[in-house]
């Protein structure tokens, strides 16, 4: 039973990864964030999600200065603004199928209207440094976490790194 449930979670995460790749393929300057959100949510529904677990929002999408804002789902509405040639976009996906959640967030950088593939190629230093720090934290987490570790142990271990 546990293996079957784990497989369902892996499938939802695979859906999220595919949806994020789709988002990277379709994002372009001039695209309205509301339209972008709708396209991402439709992709999730067309490819296996039956609903969205976080207040029925399947894709939280922010760009520019909005990426530094934290918004509760009951107050979220995608901005009626367009993506710029040089922009930072955050996407947080929350699909579900039969009560099994997917949860996946990424940042996309556009430079001269094109998605930047490598962090080292980002010209905007603040964005580059933020993504480098995120990468460092992720790699550190992967290096120190194991199946038997409690959240308390993880918290203690992370605090020793600062």
Where are these regions (language model features)?
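Active-site neighborhoods and metal-handling regions in enzymes and metal-associated proteins
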Residues: 1-162
